[in-house]
Amino acid sequence: MPNLDLYNFPMAPASRAIQMVAKALGLELNSKLINTMEGDQLKPEFVRINPQHTIPTLVDNGFVIWESRAIAVYLVEKYGKPDSPLYPNDPQKRALINQRLYFDMGTLYDALTKYFFLIFRTGKFGDQEALDKVNSAFGFLNTFLEGQDFVAGSQLTVADIVILATVSTVEWFSFDLSKFPNVERWLKNAPKVTPGWEQNLESLQQGKKFLQDLQAAKEKEVKA
């Protein structure tokens, strides 16, 4: 069994994505907590591992890689079965998966960061323009899922797992997914087809409580 250390904040979408990919591959991860809310990522011992001080960061027997989508692909390529459906060898299938991963990073996750995740730093959501970009991103995803059960072809791939980690995060907030019926259907199907989904839900609940506690603390500060 490989020695895989994952430096992560378990409730964060990117960390949850890697937890699920590892589960799909039957891999055990040594989870190393990096609490970014307390600045753990800036400690010298972590910066020596990852000078960009981002999470998640994977250390595989001395080999270091960060950026969750790169980690996901690396794990499947190294530890998955030959021509794994999670990331097939076929260039066109792989290209579509890559496109969806880049869509998540540059469009969907980016939109959520600038609207929803702003609350962790400012105590407030983003402005209307930021919300419009969230709706636009979900609209694209809804189109990708038209007439199919997965985001990049006819089977579950790393693109589904990574994007499910992103999309499921809206459960922390009051966001109506019914406007995007294909996305809603896909998310509801996730427990049936996604390895590690129970762990994802546990981490989601921890994140929701963390957010509630954070909001309560900020409200108390305002009243004081």
Curated annotation (Swiss-Prot):
Its EC number is 2.5.1.18. Residues 90-210 form the GST C-terminal domain. Coiled coil: none annotated. GO terms for biological process: glutathione metabolic process; response to toxic substance. It holds the Pfam family GST_N. Residues 2-83 form the GST N-terminal domain. Glutathione binds at residues 53-55, 67-69. Disulfide bonds: none annotated. The keyword Nucleus does not apply. Conjugation of reduced glutathione to a wide number of exogenous and endogenous hydrophobic electrophiles. May be involved in detoxification. This is Glutathione S-transferase D7.
